[in-house]
Swiss-Prot record:
The active site is at E317. It is found in: Secreted. Disulfide bonds join C196-C267, C274-C292. SUPFAM superfamilies: Metalloproteases ('zincins'), catalytic domain. PANTHER family: NEUTRAL PROTEASE 2-RELATED, PTHR37016. This is Probable neutral protease 2 homolog TRV_02539. Residues 20-188 form a propeptide. Pfam families: Peptidase_M35.
Amino acid sequence: MQLVAALAALGALVAPAVAYPHAPMNETLVDVQLTAVGNTMVKATITNKGDSVLNMLKFNTIMDENPTRKVMVFQDGAEVPFTGMMPRYLMSDLTEEFFTTLAPQASVEHSFDIATTHDLSAGGKYVISASGAIPTAEEYSTTITSTALYESNELHMEIDGTQAAAVEQAMKFTPEMQSIHSRALQKRTKIVGGSCNQNTLRATQNALGNSARLAQAASRAASQNAAKFQEYFRTNDANAKQRVIARLNSVARESSSANGGSTTYYCSDTVGGCKPRVLAYTLPSRNLVVNCPIYYNLPPLTKQCHAQDQATTTLHEFTHNPAVASPHCQDYAYGYQQCISLPAAKAVQNADNYALFANGMFYSLFTIIF
């Protein structure tokens, strides 16, 4: 009851206009160059252009080892749909294995096959580019202190469609999985019961309910609290505000029922995306969300400001689904300091900004009331 009362009052919270500290966002610290090294193989060369050592977190960047969205692929001016995974990573207690260290002016190379995360069977001419933000720590540290934005060159490739079609998709469905997913879509079932046990089903249903209430309350706060909206989304532009409100309302609707909707939700891994530190992931090409084992180690709803929990992880993942809101959100940055340092155009399209905004609004009221 206290939770419901707190969430219901969120929209009425009014904060004074204040300035908020930013984590340093450096737009010239890292250079990324793309080159073709095969029919669909791309090599990214990442160079530290600064004068100090960088410890770079690989999650959701051009260096991520998982089949995440590393590049944008266009043909005839239209973006080729991404078929890989969009994960939310556990960001607490980071260890060195998830970082790449670069000395000043040094470079590291990372190669990947774009045919594993895009259908390129049509063949022909394609344009590939990359943009994003790399969280960075100081040498010998895993504490994120800054973020380096990057924009790559445009890479033009002539791709053989037959060869591309022979490349196995990273998130490949088995015939059994395809059958389960098809039946779920026909029944418009949100949670696939066969993927859950009693405990994970209860936790997922609870997270959906909390996600709905958080999104509804955050939508009200976005329309009534200009200072907080500016803090999290770096703008008070009316059009941007309407996009954020509409997306939060869509997330609230999608979270409101476990028996219908536009997405399919799995309590356990189905396609092999639960890699180390992955809490949950989305396949935007299928409007499918999967909880990973460590998701259930999170609290249902945290009382810590900007901490991760089950409710905001579910909210985060729903923003990645095109059926919930189009265009769906990307993963440009993680964590409060990094997210509020994004330019407005990226902040309103970044999944974690929505999760953090919903959490921050709830936490602000929680500390006042309780």
